[in-house]
Every structure is written in structure tokens, then in C-alpha cells.
Amino acid sequence: MNKPFIIDAHLDLSMNALEWNRDLRQPLKEINRREIGMTDKPDRGNATISFEELRKGNVGLVVATQIGRYVGPDNPLPGWHSPEQAWAQTQGQLAWYKAMEEEGQMVMIRDKKALETHLALWKDSEPADKKPIGYVLSIEGADSFITVNHVERAYAYGLRAVGPAHYGPGRYANGTDSTGHLNAMGKELLRTMDRLGMILDVTHLCDEAFWDALDLYKGPIWASHNNCRAFVDHNRQFSDEMIKALIERGAVIGIALDAWMMVPNWVRGESTPRGMNCGMEIMANNIDHVCQLAGNANHVAIGSDLDGAFGTEQCPYDLVTIADLQKIFPILQYRGFTDDAINRIASGNWIEFLRKHLPE
């Protein structure tokens, strides 16, 4: 089959640019060469993403993040010591996206018209190396909204999706490895997002906050990068009950490629993808599991999270660059997935969702 057009619903591109100091305009080999000998991050020299590799893989549209965590005095996680600092970080990330737009490397997809224009551009026969990567702007964790009113400011500059939580306790909602119901600020955040017509990303919400959010939120919901608890029994993944509830809400779930979410008993810094037999077949297992629960292929897609503070040391052994996302489709074809189902998983489900829920 031809290379399907891919939408990847979770890439921390600005984090890579500004915290990892990676110039994504450079070839991937050069990005990794400049990190030889560096030890400040666990994934130095193991990057999988550059603009060139996105184009090679026919990944023409992504959901790209802002991220800035606030941590209180008793929170051991890395993060900023005030929401104002976290907000400033996200604004620096926005400035990088704007700089990439001015360079012609990226284009923001704010509304339905921009979406259709961009999809038409990637359908034409011009070589992909001349085409900008489209991005829908999302935020991973809402800590950086100094007040709930800041979400309105963010919507005005193009933010279209919000994940209220990340790891640990958050100002608006508690996330992975944490517990607790949505607080008053979190509920107010959801009401504001609802009024603006924003997309709620339920990825990383702890179980109690997940169910609170589904009850409270009336607008569009997706899970940009989340796998199945049936395979890795950890609160970071969704139980079958959660997946079924999302299917009922018309959500799409993006399957992620962080190895610890793919195989049980992964030990960070010790386990290896080959040693744990973590390959793209595991991604196919997660895709198939959601399809079995849904009875169709309409609610699952790709949200790789590649280079999300991990690289080739902690992703499928048969993926060296993001262009290797294309390897999932022959695996699905071999398992009996139709071309229509494969195209839905590659991008069709995200396209349908965005056509329905982006503003006019």
C-alpha cells in the first residue's frame, strides 16, 4: 500500500526545541551528533524527530504541545515554583512555534478552513519536503494557566485542546500516579473550555478526575496519547470501562509509543526495547484492543509521544525515526485490517474529529 497520510496527536516539539535545545530543522543525525557525551537528559543522542523525518513519514499534521508544570514545596517532580513562571515557559514555546511558522516549517491549524486548506496541500503531488507541518496547538497540564481567565487568552492565540493534568498533583486536576477528584478550579476550567468549544484531552487524568470530567464536560473529548490497562496494569493507562465510556462520547484515543506504557515491568534506565520484546506489534495490540471494544476502527489513532523525554532507548525496537510510524500499517494489514480501517487509524479518525469540532 502507499504511505498513508499520518496525523500524530501528541508531540512535544517546543519542549524539544527549548528544553532539549534541538533544532528540528536539522537532519536527525546532526541533532543526535550534537548530543554525544551529554548526560543531562536520559535520552540524549536518541532523538527520533526532525521536520525532515516527519515529512519522510508522511506525518503532515500533528497535535503539538505547550507544557509547563507548577510544583509546590512538597512536590518532588521537576517543575516551576510559581504558575507565573510556568506561564512564561509556555509563552516561550508559543514564540518558537511562531518562529517556525515564519520559516515556513509549520502552520497553525486554528479552524476548519485552515484544516481543509492544509489537507488539500498534502494531497497534491508536490514533494513533501516543500510542505509545512500543520499543527493543532494543545497544552499538556493546565498548571500554567495563572487564572482560569488565562485559558481565554490562550484560546485567542490558537490553543484548541487542553489536558488539565500531567504527572502528579496539579493545580486544576490530579494526574498520573496521583488520586483525587476535580477541585473547584478544575471544574471552573472545564466550564470555561466548554463555553469556548475547546477539546478536552483526558490523557493523564487520575481515575477520579477522569470520571468527574466525563460527567461535567459537555464538549468534545479525546485522549491524545493513551494505551490500554489490559496490557500494562497501571493508572497511566485506560481500563476497558474507561475506553468504553470514551467510545460512547465519540472520542478518539491515540496510541502511544513509550515502552513502559507498552510492556509490563519496564524499568526506566535498565530495560531495553529488545530485551523486553517491545516492538510495533505491541502498538498493533493496543489498536486492536480498542477496535474490539468499539466493534469498529473509528475510535483509535496515533498519538506517539515520541521524544517526550524518551527516545530510541525507550520506544519500539523497530522504530528508529518517526518516519517508521509507517511500519504499523503492514502489521495491521497482515492482521486483517481493511485499507479503510488503516486509513482511519493513520489520520481519518482525527480528521473527522477535527472537522466536527474545530471552530468555523
Label every PLM stretch briefly.
Residues 1-179, 184, 233-360:
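N-terminal hydrophobic targeting/anchoring segments and the immediately downstream early-domain regions
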Residues 6-13, 205, 223-226:
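Histidine-centered catalytic micro-motifs
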Residues 179-215, 220-225:
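Loop-centered beta-sheet repeat module
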Residues 207-208, 228-230, 259-262:
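Short, catalytically relevant binding-site loops at active-site mouths
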Residues 222, 227, 306-309:
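Short acidic (Asp/Glu) and glycine-rich catalytic loops that position anionic groups and cofactors
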